Amino acid sequence: MTQPLLRFGIHNFLNAGPLLLPLEEQGANMGFQVMTDSPAALADRLKSSDLDLAIIPSVEYFKLAESYRLVSDVCIASRGEVGTVLFLTKKPINKISSIAADNRSRTSVALLKLLFSFNSDLSIRSFPPDLESMLVDHSAALIIGDVAFKLSELDPSITVYDLSEEWFRQTGKTFVHAVVAVRKNIFLSQSQKKFIQQAKIEGCGRVKEVVRGYRGLPGIEAKVLENYLEKKIGYDLNEAAIDGLTHFNNLCYQQGIISKKHAIKFL
């Protein structure tokens, strides 16, 4: 009897492209049904068992770490300026009273709270990622993903913070945006795990092809997107990334963003 395909969720931003390309081409042969969605939606779908494994925001892994195991060696990370996790404000940090946060984001909202000392009565509300509408009734906005590439010719009164760059400035550590989490009751064979790890390596060697086939950012020069994938995004959950992820876990616990501190556990 044929085993059902494991439902594998992956987000549809450019930074997932090097992982997504090999998975879409070869995933079915390895027992995966690949599904795309936003990072926040993937986290919710994995939690509700609508997915068996998914690339989810790192903060969402820590919220439910007892229910998940991670695929080793694979993540989406950055070390310094990344350009796709942007906090834009019309006021000084200590004067901000409300923030419109990209409704596709989870980890970036947590990161924002960790990096800045906001007023205790700060309001953060989720909005579709449209800067103009977000700033109508709010002092600041958080925008992630491909939409951030399109933010040009901003009003000079708007101050822009790259949250990955700010994290590195404050901590000196890699920031892990997303991890590959598998529900505890799901069996992933060694060949399937190795396939995911090899997909990362293969995809990183096909960046030009990823960019050429990507339709989400018309008008942005290919060399800009290639530089982003090759120089600003990292895909190895290596020692430095695990150190940064652990530090993020500790800070989230200290600030009450997560209720319990968990050790990182792998398959």
Place the predicted regions along the sequence by residue:
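Short helix-initiation/N-cap motifs at beta->coil->alpha
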Residues: 33-44, 121-139
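Beta->alpha turn/N-cap motifs
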Residues: 14-15, 38-39, 50-62, 74, ...
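Short, well-ordered beta-strand elements
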Residues: 2-12, 32-35, 97-102
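A bilobed periplasmic-binding-protein/Venus flytrap-type ligand-binding module shared by bacterial periplasmic
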Residues: 22, 84-93, 98, 175-190
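A conserved helix-loop-strand patch within extracytoplasmic ligand-binding domains
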Residues: 74-131, 160-162, 166-168
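Pocket-lining segment of extracytoplasmic ligand-binding domains
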Residues: 128-214
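Ligand-binding cleft/hinge of the Venus flytrap
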Residues: 18-30, 108-127, 208-212
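Secondary-structure end/capping motifs
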Residues: 187-251, 255
